[in-house]
Amino acid sequence: MYSSSNSFLNPNAARPGQQQYGQPQQQYTGFQQQQQPTGFMPQPTGFAGGQMQPMQPQPTGNFSRGPFQQSSFQAQPPQMTGYPPQNQPFQPQQQQSQTMQQQSTPAPSLPARLPGQTSSQIANSFQTISSPTTGVNPHHAPSKIPTQRLSFITAQDQAKFEQLFKSAVGDSQSMDGETARDLLLRSKLPGSELSKIWVLSDTTKSGHLLFPEFALAMYLCNLRLTGRELPPSLPDRVKNEVSSMVDIISFAVPDDNPPVAPKTNVPNFDQPLMQNTSAPPAPQQPQPQQPSNSQLLSQLTAQPTGFYNQATGFQPPSIVAPQPTGFPGQNASLRPQATGLQPNPQATGYTGPRPPMPPMPAGFGSSLSPSQTGAPPLAAQPTGIPGQWGFVNAPATGLPNIEALKQRLMPQPSREGGYTTAGLAGNATIPWAVTKDEKKIYDQLFRAWDGLNKGFIGGDVAIEIMGQSGLDRQDLERIWTLSDPHNRGRLNMDEFAVAMHLIYRKLNGYPIPNRLPPELIPPSTRNLDDSIGAVKSMLSQDAEQRKVSGAFFQPQKTGVSYLKTHSFRTGSASPGLGRKDATVFKNNDDDVVAYKSSARRRAGGTPSPSPSSTPAEKVDNDLSVEQLKKKIRETQIMLDATDFRDENRAEEDEVLNRRDRKEAESLMERIRRVQDDIDTDLKAAFRNADSGAERRALRRQLQAFQDQLPELASNVRKLERSIADSKLELFRLKDAKLHPGAAMEIIGTGPGGAVTEADRIKARARARMQARAAELAGRPAPQADDGSAARRLEEEKATVAAERERHDAMTRDVEESVKEFSQSLEDSLRDQDENSTRDHERRRWEEALGVEDQIRDLIFDLQRNRRTAKVRKEEERAMRADNSSYLQPQARNRSPVNDDGRRRTSPLRSASASPSFAGLSHEERVASARERAQKRIAERMAAAGLRPSSDASESFPERQEREKREKEERRRRAEEEDAKREAERQKRLAQEKSPVTSPPPKPSSKKPPPPPSRKVRTDVTESVEAKKAEDSVVASKARAEQEEKERALKQEQEAQEAERKQLEDEAKRQEEELAREKEAAQARLRALEEQVRQGKIKKQEEKRRKQQAEKEAKEKEARLAAQRAELEAAQARERELQRQLENMGEEESSSDDEGPIEITPQTSTPTQSQVLPAPFPQPSPPTAALPVPAIQEPDQDVAREPSPTLPSPVETPEPVKQTLPPETESRNPYFRQLSQQSAPSAAQPTHEMQSTNPFHRLAQQESTSKSAFTTDATVPGPLERKSRVRPEEDDWSAAESENESDEDDDRVAGGSAKQLASILFGTMAPPRPLSAMDEKTESKAQSPVQNAVVTPPPPPPAPEADDSPEIEAEREIADMSPAAPDDAGFYTPPSIPPPPPPPMPGMEASAGAPPPPPPPPPGDAPPPPGGAPPPPPGPPPPAPPGPAPGPPGREAGRGALLADIKAGKGLRKVVTKDRSGVATAGRVL
């Protein structure tokens, strides 16, 4: 290839083993030319010898033209030949060996110069430092260093480096390796460091250093000299700056001015281009090229013979044909001749393997090279200038696999992936530039893929084309980057050719360059960039010249244009070419073929139609028939192309229209969804509040209010005046009544009856006359007026006037504030008024004025949907109102609390709506009225979507204080309401539980079925309510639909009809669902009733068994009473007590720990002696008030807990009424009931809350019974009649306590003794009453009353006992029990035999003794040691007295205890025998 503009930067950068065209060819000593053909005769140039010997350089011609350069050719040294003034030697070409070396061995007699060293060789040369050789630098144009600043060095250092660089390179643009080596060695750095510096500095790897690279090398040397380490690689900033400056220097070198090569005997093909660069040379006869190196080495036929031709101006006498030389003007007639007698034409010069030759200008005789003569035809030769496309022929070896590449890359109907380089790869010699054949193939590929004639190929298509080559993705990415320098994402025809050429080179083993060489830069891009640069330089030079010469201030008057001296071409325009440059363009109207009116430039005598025809008509007239036909065909082709282009454009427009329609449809669908969201939003009512009509209505309403304001203020002032007059009149009357005769009656004659000074004078005169008349008549003188009444009246007047003034000021303030507020409202309404443009736009999109039909349909559809959503919302609002009005009476019927709550909330609502002004001063009333007015106006504005201006009269701290006060007031009112509500609830609960005192039913009679549960009633009621609500919804929807039908248009009626049908279907479906729910609720109700009935039957059977057991118990009790009568009283009792006390330490059980701790049982714990048989009606002595658990009615229990899983009827206890302070309670009624029951046991921290799940409680009870069986727990006394009712918080069931009593009767004696001891030491009571109580408990243990349920008549309230905390707690707990003893389980049947005779006094005393408490619930902590009593529980509220009778008096016989103990021992087996029969009594299974 020809030497490019920057070929001097990298003379050996081509493929290894090849030399770039235009570079000095290096000769090697590895191949000596020994054999000479004998047919050659010595050339008559004055030298003898038939064979070539190594010769010294022998310059010929004029030596004054310049020094010659030493070449590296060993076999044939260079010789200066030719005409001396041309200063260009003939350069013979020598053969090269197959294995080419980069450096030749210098001859001993000549100093070695290494002109072709690579960057790596120069870097290695630093390792073995030796004295460098000097050489002569080639002649270059003056070096120009860009003014760009390098940031990694200072400006002073850069100036020094520039001076050093210029002094070292002279006029050259680059510094060769030897010079750089000399300079770097002066730093005295080791060779390894200098080698690293060279590798980092030579960024182009060309063996030369440009100025930025040289400055970088100096910078790195300075780093190393200062002791810092060299970086392994250059920083990105430094690298970018250096490469940018290198590019600027490289691109500044013009393509048509290559550097002068060293003067050698190699032919210089660039010389013809130096003569006239403005006109490109014509293609000339190319030189033949050898096919391959192997043929050359095997044949060795092309040998230089004799001495080289020397054009000395004369022709030597020889057998060789003369070679004409001479001046450039003679070159047209000269013909190059072969130098020798060869049987065949043989090429001379360089005959080794070489790449295809780039375009070479030839035909000028200034630098003739040896060429073949003889037999034509002539082979094609690459011609042209560097980088010019279309003049580069294919190499002699051809372009292998180019057709295969074309066939693969052509569009095919079915292609498959997975392409490889098989069949495309090779090792052909490919030049840098694109050859003619390649360009033709690449253009065909481009046109085949560019079916729409767009002029470019997109990235997706290029990926498909380039991917079929089989190259790696990384290589294709690099090729694309080089081909698309402007990053446009597409390739035109030239850029596509560059990409295909790089792919073809890569397939043949060539590396992909980092930067696109100048030969591959497309002409359009390069010429455009060069033209822009030339224009810029010309403009800058012209401006500089005019500024220096002062031409800016001297207008040009001569009319001479100097543009002819400006040209894009460096040389002057050739006169014979006739080509114009853009700088000397002149418009010629005659060349324009267009219509020209004949009326233009019409002279006076010229006829109207001009007889002369236009040049275009002349041209048409001169055309022949064939030319006209050709023109017609061309026009037809153009018309066809236009039609095809129009069709393609129409198709593209149709595609775009379809895409636009799809997008428009998607947008309209999104608009509909957004409109639906807006319509269904809760705040959609405020959406249209900002319309113009709404604002105008608000302004009219505001104006009406403003008109009413003066009248209201006048009325207020009149009222104030009348109030003031009334106050004065009232004061006069009161003062006259308090001070009779003190005031003078003064009749006012002033305006309005006002008293004037004259009236007062007259009154005083009248008073004096009356006094004188009384004195004359002897009557007592009337009381003289001392002026006190007048003073009091004046004071009152002043007070009334001041108050009136104050009220007037307040009225004015209110009036002004209302005016300001109304002004702000008016301003806000006026600011939002729409102008004509906005109104037009609003009407356009809201009323569909001036829009397309499709948009109009969309707007109407949105409006219909909006109206439908509005109607639906109104119906839902009406339905909610109907539901609320329907649910209120239902709520009143269902719960009596609702009336109270409604009565409580309605005053609050009315108070908030119209607050009472009682007890407020006038100022406070005015302020309240003002605040309410502002609040209403603010609410209206908020509903209208307006923002009124903030009230500046109230500061931020004042507003905070006011809000804080209001918040505190609301909280206080809420607390009061909660307290009232809680009190009413407690009262209602007490009314529900206490009045049930009906006589107990007979055991044989069947209980009435319990009422359905509240939950079931609620479900039924709610279902009925829902049904009615749905009916009302359907009716309201029907009415709304009817109204909508009357208003809607004809096309809207169909949509409304469909919607009505849908709503009817929905209503039917909802009615069916309600019916199904109602049936399910009825089924559940029937199931619950059946379960209740079965439970009652089981309960009756249980009652019969208990009655039978009760009979047996009474018989045993009669026998026990007879035995107690026969026992001794005092002595035996004392001995037995002593024995029990001694046995306390011997028995170890849980009763020691748990017995005494529960002296005061909890509300939820079954207690002792709460139900006594009827034969003992004596009142309770004041010893102790026994606690009684809550006894609940079975009807209420069943009604409240209708669990369908219960196998047997179980009465769950009703919560014990307890009233706690409202602030400490939860507002959940169920939670309050639990907290009320657990409040008395709050003093014991170990008590646990139990679950309300019946199955969970069953498991707890079973675990509790098991623990009671395995532990020595304290059991209640056997005489006690257990209640099967268990509170919700109770961990012990009634049945469980009975089982424990039955199963643990064998430990009753020991447990009773321990309990007696605990009671004795805990209550500090006398031992005798405690013994009597224990005796009574032990004696009653023999009775099986616990297995039967007897209901005694309601006993009288327990009398007051002593003030011990335990007794008080027991009394309070007993008081909490309800007074309803109508449980069927506690009824005493009439068949019970009469009780035995009354026992002894001791027995009477022991009858009501408090039994030991039952064991605490599981998890309770053990009692404190020593049997200390627990702290008393918190005081519960009073409740109706329980049914348990009071215990007997403390005084009892001492023998009763001994009899009780002995009887207890005998009762063990009896009770144990009967426990199986009553094991399930009262237990929840």
From Swiss-Prot:
One of its GO terms (biological process) is endocytosis. Keywords: Actin-binding, Cell membrane, Coiled coil, Cytoplasm, Cytoskeleton, Endocytosis, Endosome, Membrane, Repeat. Residues 1144-1156, 1288-1306 have a biased composition (Acidic residues). One of its GO terms (cellular component) is endosome membrane. Residues 157-245, 438-527 form the EH domain. It is found in: Cell membrane; Endosome membrane; Cytoplasm, Cytoskeleton, Actin patch. Residues 1-119, 253-379, 596-622, 773-843, 868-1485 are annotated as: Disordered. The keyword Cell membrane applies. It comes from the Eukaryota. Residues 16-59, 67-107, 290-301, 1160-1170, 1235-1245 have a biased composition (Low complexity). It is a peripheral membrane protein. Residues 280-289, 997-1013, 1174-1184, 1390-1401, 1409-1448 have a biased composition (Pro residues). Residues 1-10, 302-315, 328-349, 882-896, 1247-1273, 1340-1349 have a biased composition (Polar residues). GO terms for molecular function: actin binding; calcium ion binding. Residues 1453-1470 form the WH2 domain. Residues 647-737, 1024-1150 form a coiled coil. Its main location: membrane. Residues 189-224, 471-506 form the EF-hand domain. The keyword Repeat applies. InterPro entries: DUF1720 (IPR013182), EF-hand-dom_pair (IPR011992), EF_hand_dom (IPR002048), EH_dom (IPR000261), WH2_dom (IPR003124). Residues 788-819, 827-843, 871-880, 921-939, 956-991, 1016-1031, 1038-1139 have a biased composition (Basic and acidic residues). It holds the Pfam family EH. Belongs to the PAN1 family. Component of the PAN1 actin cytoskeleton-regulatory complex. Component of the PAN1 actin cytoskeleton-regulatory complex required for the internalization of endosomes during actin-coupled endocytosis. The complex links the site of endocytosis to the cell membrane-associated actin cytoskeleton. Mediates uptake of external molecules and vacuolar degradation of plasma membrane proteins. Plays a role in the proper organization of the cell membrane-associated actin cytoskeleton and promotes its destabilization. This is Actin cytoskeleton-regulatory complex protein PAN1.
